[in-house]
Amino acid sequence: MDPARKVEAPFHFYSGMDRPLGIQAQSLLEFLEAVKRVGTESLEFHLYRGDFERWIKDVLNSAFLHSRISALRRDGVRGEELRRRLVGVLEEWIGFYLYKRP
């Protein structure tokens, strides 16, 4: 999956129920940039509802990323540690994709 490929169903970031941030991501690269700038309360809200996993599995079709993000939820990470680890997972996958391309 090309990390720059735009998808039809963007991910919309919220800080809580019925509290949209007005930030969306239509590609994995946009998702990474949004993860770097939204508040940690938004990251926690989406991680523990399973929103990230669902979007990555259903829209981006990435079993690898799905399993790695599921592990973050199971580990119970929060706050800036969550951001750091989520960014690491995304950058690792993007780096792998770019490295393996001919």
What kind of region is each of these model predictions?
Residues 1-102:
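Terminal, compositionally biased segments used for targeting/anchoring and flexible tails
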